[in-house]
């Protein structure tokens, strides 16, 4: 009696894994129109003075170049490695600023490699910049389909 149950379990698992692999393949095969596109977003942080901006180039249906920045509309400056100066004396915010700066630098590289925003994972401690990046990319790609 155990053999049919084990066989059924393995058969079910095989079907499930096949379906999962198929759906993941479908997500990564989306092709976009060649051109240059921009997207701007504040993601879910609508009460903060920050917004993200993505400029991407699509060549042969795939993203070939991508630039990402976060701007502070109150201070009129770009979020960068020096932004932590605004949090002098607050070690937690300084570390958060550093983590998010790592995200700003790495998300475009990871996205260019994966070609699927859903396959880009947030850098540890950099969810804020990840959410802004993801929303900005999605906004840019709306016009590229």
Give the ranges of each region predicted by the language model:
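Active-site- and interface-proximal helix/loop "cap" or "latch" segments in soluble metabolic
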Residues: 27-36, 40-53, 57-145
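Bacterial N-terminal signal peptides
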Residues: 9-18
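Sec-dependent signal peptide cleavage junction
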Residues: 19-29
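Bacterial N-terminal signal peptides that target proteins for export
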Residues: 1-9
